[in-house]
């Protein structure tokens, strides 16, 4: 059971148990403090709130792109490179700026420990809880590389998840894909020229997943799928708009 209430301010928290393998990571009784946000405009046309979520495990930083009154939200996470990295030539900032026009809020999450699957999953769950505190009741998750396993683990923790997108996923940690919430739709994307994570990782994950599911393999595309950036954006956006219930198409 995941209990990460963002409204709480008590910092005396119990240690979170972890389970890896066929069961999803479980996070129990972690209380968090959400810092006041600051509006940032890093470049023309892009504006977001900087959100810092404090726990006894450290501070998780996020970029929040709000759609006023949205009931749907999307959390995006990267791979082991850390920071606010993005595949496909800036897929994440592009999506994050576009989704609010469809009444979907977006949150990009920076891992505290980008090589640690469990801690990265906690970060993703914290992101979902932050969106919940902003009125979001249905969630989509997008993850690249390690982030593919992260969003599968996070989705298996929360029945509010309606859409999952895994891009160039690793195999380790994807076992809970068979236990996603009922009706949660998962899209798996890989390049057949990926030399970092094998396309077989996505193919095996697809075989274990329940419907609705979709597998897309881009010919000649590598790990970051820069070669397919345009069509990847269209594919991911269409999946989110189709499976999040309150969106504007």
Regions found by a protein language model. Name each.
Residues 2-69:
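N-terminal cap/lid segment of alpha/beta-hydrolase-fold proteins
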């Amino acid at each position: 059971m995941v209990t990460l209430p963002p409204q709480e301010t008590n910092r005396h928290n119990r240690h979170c148990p972890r389970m890896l393998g066929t069961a999803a990571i479980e996070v129990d009784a972690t209380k968090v403090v959400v810092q006041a946000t600051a509006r940032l405009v890093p470049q023309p046309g892009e504006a977001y709130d900087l959100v810092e979520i404090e726990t006894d495990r450290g501070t998780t930083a996020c970029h929040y792109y709000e759609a006023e009154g949205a009931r749907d939200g999307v959390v995006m996470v990267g791979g082991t490179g850390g920071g606010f990295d993005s595949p496909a030539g800036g897929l994440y900032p592009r999506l994050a700026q576009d989704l609010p026009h469809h009444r979907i809020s977006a949150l990009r999450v920076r891992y505290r420990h980008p090589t640690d699957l469990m801690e990265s999953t906690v970060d993703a769950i914290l992101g979902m809880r932050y969106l919940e505190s902003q009125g979001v009741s249905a969630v989509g998750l997008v993850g690249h590389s390690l982030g593919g396993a992260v969003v599968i683990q996070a989705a298996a923790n929360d029945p509010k998840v309606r859409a999952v997108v895994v891009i160039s996923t690793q195999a380790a940690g994807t076992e809970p894909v068979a236990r996603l919430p009922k009706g949660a739709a998962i899209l798996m994307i890989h390049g057949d020229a990926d030399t970092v994570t094998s396309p077989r990782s996505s193919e095996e994950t697809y075989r274990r997943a329940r419907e609705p599911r979709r597998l897309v393999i881009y010919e000649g595309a590598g790990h970051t799928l820069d070669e397919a950036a345009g069509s990847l954006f269209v594919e991911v956006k269409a999946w989110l708009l189709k499976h999040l219930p309150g969106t504007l198409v």
